[in-house]
């Protein structure tokens, strides 16, 4: 910034010296001081002062002789440097004093104020009950407070009853910003206050927030009424801020010109003692409604509707007229939808959407049309439902052409026979094309009554010449349609050989609320053409109404193939409902009243009909003849495909179903839509895959000649030894990874004879490097398969020579035999064996033979498969030509069956043991190798931890011994999580102890390791609150105390807060006559505080032996005795105590309950406790993320050797936990009452 100022000021200070020096350089310093003290964008002035001082050191003197020129130069420099056109420097030699701002209105008398207000504020009520308020200068807060009642009674009340308001600010260029909240508040609802602006004043360096007023004199203008603000290029300052705020609030529509982009407060200040003055904006709007960005200052307020200022009022009144009509338009639209719209199920959604739409931005009929259509289309998805603008005479209420009416007047049928024959000849063009192909063109659909009258003539002149043709082309390219009443009659002529009437289509008419099924006519003049011969309809973009209905139905019924252009998409079955009438025009709704539903249950929404073969209209006839030639062979192609399936597909029962489906669809005309071999292949493939659920079934078109798969290929040329070495190195990638981990990648499966031929070289160059590794990774991620004949040989290397292993079985369709595939007794080179780990990497691109190898090894539990699921390939694929055509069918000819289950697996593909993205498969395999190498030491460590620490030494030693013998069970473990589950399950089976647990806790979850992370001790203040919430006390009826806590704490910790416990807990219950201790929800915790708690319920002397605890890690027995010294009073041994238990009472809570019951100090009431254990210890297993939680201590205080661990504490009074408290109160009350 400083560099920019140096350049600017150097420009200002340096010009060629003139004869007269107007001022000293201090003028620039004075100007800079005014900017620094008054300019409302001080952040833009950073570095200016230093730049001026630097420029002054150059001793360059500004020497312009003309002061006006100097003022212009200074203005241009300041405006360009600050990018602010509001900064202006003027030369005014006649001004002796600094110019004052406009006279302050508060210095005027009341009469003068009223006169001033009446000049600046004018109002009236315009035609249509539109309020008009013109403000040319906005008074400030003091004046509005002084004259508020006058303005309300003489101005505002006259406007309150209007239906809308025009606020005219076109001539307002001044005012005080303190008046802004008054204007905004009268137009803002009074239920909330709103922050509308923040004004920064530079001279005082203060920021003032502008909020709407919570209360105003008089009434506020209703929020339901429209407000329009008029602006012009002269609208400035405070008026701009008002227009901007109302626009951002969406409370007003701004109409007119962009405002001048001035400032809230401009001041003209003298520069030093010179005759130069600087006009500078001293205040600025921070505009919270604009999101904190740049507001209107400098750029102006852009109107919602731009128009010249002198036309703004007229435009505003037109907008208000439209907006007054909006509720009526929406209401009529909703009524029209309810009364006429044929898709009744969509009406509620449309009504709701219309009611919830925001119309605040609608300022023209075009806006309204766009908004309504967007809403209607979004909900209905019906292109026929449309709002449109109408001309002055185009908005009368009338339905469009109905379903039984013609868009043009139907010509009268002549009575003379010659005239009728001539009429038929003029409407129909009939000819027979080469190849015995009938051609029929007619350019208009007639009413059913007309056809009935002209029937004999049409039959004789049109229909009979076409009866013996093999195919029929009907030309509708020039047919704009007509009435559709004759549709069932016309369609009936194309019905098949069925005896009874056939349902053609269904219609629903909203006006009559009738759903009607339309059937073919039983009796017809003349013969039917039927649907066994090919019928081809030619269409164009001019084909409309009844003509496109006919095309749609013929295509839907499968009776015709359409060729040409997409039709017009204009239907007859709509109604026009006027929504708005005005002298200039109006709005109308086009609403569909009738819906066509074809035999598939699909409703036609009136879009253009899409032909099966899309070509230009002028090319349609030629293309139809090409399609016709193709269809002559259609039956043979479909039948041929079905026969190939039955003969070669690997799943015979599916092949029969597939062929039956093809025959059925052919008979129904489903393949008439196929217009070439490509589209037929696509349809056949979709049908075959749908019925078989086999993605490997394909029909495709190949113009070139394919080599039949049954023909043996010529033997490949035998490569030289050098070439063979090069090929092997290129095709096979090997490596020995750290840890003696072999890696083998090959991306193709060769044929068995080829593998045998190059066997010695493969063994020498590839296999010998890998056979002695500790484990092997076979990477098939990039192997699409190919020949499967070498799979048994590959598998054999990973099993022993004897006994031979059944790998899988193959069902061959050609022989209809199942062949079992076994490992080979002899292989070249050394076997890898059956004991070393094998890992196979797969991806979604791995196919056929690669899948066979992976699935076989996985099925026999010989390998761990890692990667992505495969798609499911085929061991053998046959490609067969359909007849002599360039159409081919590709299908699996063999089916792979699992050796273990006998089920076919090849279609489903291979599901990995561990599913990861293919990019992570190798690293995952390496991690598993490392993990499996750790398993023996992990089991050894786990056994030692159990033997050394389990609370029962004998059982711990037995578990350790048995665990080492289970190592083979872990041979296929794939993750530490799985290892933790298996180890935990084995330990619990061996011990019968559910508290002996194993967990896998990753590095990022160490806070969940029990017993590892110490609990943070809170401050005494926090602890005081914690105690109050953790302990629940009460004194019940008959002075029975109640104490509940749900966890035991550490003794050392509780000692630190013992005084808090006594003060806030114990003192409340110590003087009761009996006590209930609620342990029903206590989950245990440290046992170190149990002796202290028990001591409160015994006398000071003599000491009582509470229990003996055996600790396995140090192989010692510790005794728990009552304490002789306690904080606070003892409860003593005489008063009754009851302890409540439940099935969740555990750990330390059970130890406490057990001691109190065994010593006869408490009556236990409730349910048998959970049978937990003394607090266990958690141990980390080697360098893994495995942790073993081991019960290390047990109670041995009972003379009979009994304990509560694992079996729980049996209450003296067994009741459900929900009734325990009630039962305890009853027993204690009975004891107290004696």
Swiss-Prot record:
Keywords: Extracellular matrix, Glycoprotein, Repeat, Secreted, Signal, Transport, Vitamin A. Expressed in the photosensitive tissues; retina and pineal gland. Residues 1-17 form the signal peptide. GO terms for cellular component: extracellular region; interphotoreceptor matrix. GO terms for biological process: proteolysis. Residues 383-417 are annotated as: Disordered. It is found in: Secreted, Extracellular space, Extracellular matrix, Interphotoreceptor matrix. The keyword Manganese does not apply. SUPFAM superfamilies: ClpP/crotonase. Sequence repeats lie at residues 18-320, 321-628, 629-929, 930-1228. Residues 18-1228 are annotated as: 4 X approximate tandem repeats. The keyword Oxidoreductase does not apply. GO terms for molecular function: retinal binding; serine-type peptidase activity. Pfam families: Peptidase_S41, Peptidase_S41_N. PANTHER family: INTERPHOTORECEPTOR RETINOID-BINDING PROTEIN (PTHR11261), RETINOL-BINDING PROTEIN 3 (PTHR11261:SF3). Belongs to the peptidase S41A family. This is Retinol-binding protein 3. The lineage of its organism: Eukaryota, Metazoa, Chordata, Craniata, Vertebrata.
